[in-house]
């Protein structure tokens, strides 16, 4: 296939157009006065959202060079979402600002390699300053504040704080659609383990890459499954019952996996297979925990059982199961409460007896999963469009809250970024490396300016007023006041800010060192032959 090649400034200019197109679409959502973006879907109603990464993923540009620029910034948003689960809009704005300032300096004759070195030095220092300024979360109120700011809704913030209080900071919190208009919190028996689906073809939601099963049957075995004939008798019965199936096994491979995937794609079988968590004796113990929680049995050859002889009665049950590429969450298992209580007491006795700190830690993990339960936030809304938007906001808020618990909190509203600029050490570097450092310092001003502009105010004026204010003061965009941010509950997770700085500087500095851009040339479609051998256009 023929290629189109662009060089030097022409190449970078095209990339910049792509960067700006994507960033301009995303940055209107920043802050409490941020707007929504409407996304056309191939089926169903349009999606209305203010979630940066969701918007970024939808953007594809016609010009291949511009599309590459957009794709690079899309990577910033996706990476920030993967690391921290929030802060994707801030990361996108920072990347755009670094590219803009960097290209100005390249046009003035700066060396891109030295600029990149300066950007990397400044980013590293900014992250160190951020870590020093982060404050550990100390109260349930602070958890509520982080969640409220991320979701843009105080009620959601309170709900997430309640959920964390019930199941603990590391507990399992899931988000489901409610059948009413109310958004409520429920605590149900449940368990989460760190294994995801064995094949991405098993997902039920291809946009979010998750598999959700309602009222599934759960097959538990410590056996490696490679032949379909072992599963066939059982699966034929589940198909007749029109029940989805979760398979938890030592491994699923070969012919068995291929057949499951083909039948899933054909729609004849709704099945998700995952590997059992942990190893050795601990794996067997966790499988037994899941069996007791779901009211099933572990099909084990050590007990003289054969998979092909397993019956429906030996399968576990649950209200819902959600599987991602890394996690499986079983909610509201069908096990008897007396059996679960007996298992909990047995694990407590083992904890009291063991002398190994490692064994104690692993037993406590199992105990928490069996007794802690799962918090389910049921999202209520008047329409499906509102429901989708609300779910995205709650998921973002959950991610932000977990990030805050992990690495602490900092002043929100872009204030911490100005604080970082003031606190960064002096670098005794050459002029061009110093230019790279200056690029990052200027870029760190961009989020607070954008928050102000989304309020209809002059970003530069707001920036200067914050600079003149006492330490820790910033711009409260919701009430258009200058306040002490942490005291007013306007806080951000340090992890989210860190991910935004690291990912934006990484991708933007690489873009600035680009000298050549190569894209595929589109082949012109040949005109169809005229019917019946006539010349085209003749009737």
From Swiss-Prot:
It holds the Pfam family Cpn60_TCP1. GO terms for molecular function: ATP binding; ATP-dependent protein folding chaperone; isomerase activity; unfolded protein binding. Keywords: ATP-binding, Chaperone, Cytoplasm, Isomerase, Nucleotide-binding. Disulfide bonds: none annotated. It catalyses: ATP + H2O + a folded polypeptide = ADP + phosphate + an unfolded polypeptide. GO terms for cellular component: GroEL-GroES complex. The keyword Transport does not apply. Its EC number is 5.6.1.7. ATP binds at residues 29-32, 86-90, 413, 492. Transmembrane segments: none annotated. GO terms for biological process: chaperone cofactor-dependent protein refolding; protein refolding; response to heat. CDD domains: GroEL. Coiled coil: none annotated. It is found in: Cytoplasm. Forms a cylinder of 14 subunits composed of two heptameric rings stacked back-to-back. Interacts with the co-chaperonin GroES. Belongs to the chaperonin (HSP60) family. Together with its co-chaperonin GroES, plays an essential role in assisting protein folding. The GroEL-GroES system forms a nano-cage that allows encapsulation of the non-native substrate proteins and provides a physical environment optimized to promote and accelerate protein folding. This is Chaperonin GroEL. The lineage of its organism: Bacteria, Fusobacteriati, Fusobacteriota, Fusobacteriia, Fusobacteriales.
């Amino acid at each position: 296939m023929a290629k189109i090649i662009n060089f030097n400034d022409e190449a970078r200019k095209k990339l910049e157009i792509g960067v700006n197109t994507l960033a301009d679409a995303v940055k209107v959502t920043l802050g409490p006065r941020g707007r929504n973006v409407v996304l056309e879907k191939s089926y169903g109603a349009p999606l209305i959202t203010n979630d940066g990464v969701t918007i970024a993923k939808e953007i594809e540009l016609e010009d291949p060079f511009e599309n590459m620029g957009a794709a690079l910034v899309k990577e910033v948003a996706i990476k920030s979402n993967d690391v921290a689960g929030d802060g994707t809009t801030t990361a996108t704005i920072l990347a755009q600002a670094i590219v803009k300032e960097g290209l100005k300096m390249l046009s003035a004759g700066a060396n891109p390699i030295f600029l990149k070195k300066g950007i990397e030095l400044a980013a590293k220092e900014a992250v160190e300053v951020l870590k020093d300024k982060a404050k550990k979360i100390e109260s349930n109120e602070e958890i509520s504040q982080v969640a409220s700011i991320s979701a843009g809704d105080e009620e959601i913030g309170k709900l997430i704080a309640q959920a964390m209080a019930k199941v603990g900071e590391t507990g399992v919190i899931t988000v489901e659609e409610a059948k009413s208009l109310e958004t409520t919190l429920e605590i149900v028996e449940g368990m989460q383990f760190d294994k995801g689906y064995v094949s991405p073809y098993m997902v039920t939601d291809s946009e979010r890459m998750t598999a959700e099963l309602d009222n599934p049957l759960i097959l538990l075995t410590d056996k490696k499954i490679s032949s379909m004939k072992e599963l066939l008798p059982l699966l034929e019965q589940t198909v007749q019952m029109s029940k989805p199936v979760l398979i938890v096994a030592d491994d699923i491979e070969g012919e068995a996996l291929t057949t499951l995937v083909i039948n899933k794609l054909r729609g004849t079988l709704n099945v998700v297979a995952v590997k059992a968590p942990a190893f050795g004796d601990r794996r067997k113990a966790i499988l037994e925990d899941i069996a007791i929680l779901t009211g099933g049995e572990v099909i084990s050859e050590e007990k003289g059982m054969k998979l092909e002889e397993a019956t429906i009665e030996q399968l576990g049950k649950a209200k819902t199961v959600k599987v991602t590429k890394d996690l499986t969450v079983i909610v509201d298992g069908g096990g008897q409460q007396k059996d679960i209580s007996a298992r909990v007491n047995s694990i407590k006795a083992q904890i009291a007896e063991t002398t190994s700190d490692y064994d104690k830690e692993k037993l406590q993990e199992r105990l928490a999963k069996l007794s802690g339960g799962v918090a389910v936030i049921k999202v209520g809304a008047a329409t499906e469009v509102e429901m989708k938007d609300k779910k995205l906001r709650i998921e973002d808020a959950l991610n932000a809250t977990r990030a805050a618990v992990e690495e602490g909190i900092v002043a929100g509203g872009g204030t911490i970024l100005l604080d970082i600029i003031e606190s960064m050490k002096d670098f005794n570097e050459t002029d061009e490396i110093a230019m790279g450092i200056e690029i990052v310092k200027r870029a760190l001003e961009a989020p607070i300016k954008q928050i102000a502009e989304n309020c209809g105010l002059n970003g530069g004026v707001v920036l200067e007023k914050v600079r003149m204010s006492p330490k820790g003061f910033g711009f409260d965009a919701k009430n258009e006041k200058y306040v002490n941010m942490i005291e007013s509950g306007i806080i951000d997770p340090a992890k989210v800010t860190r991910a935004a700085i690291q990912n934006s500087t990484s991708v933007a500095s690489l873009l600035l060192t680009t000298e050549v851009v190569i894209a595929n040339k589109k082949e012109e479609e040949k005109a169809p032959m005229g019917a019946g051998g006539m010349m085209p256009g003749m009737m």
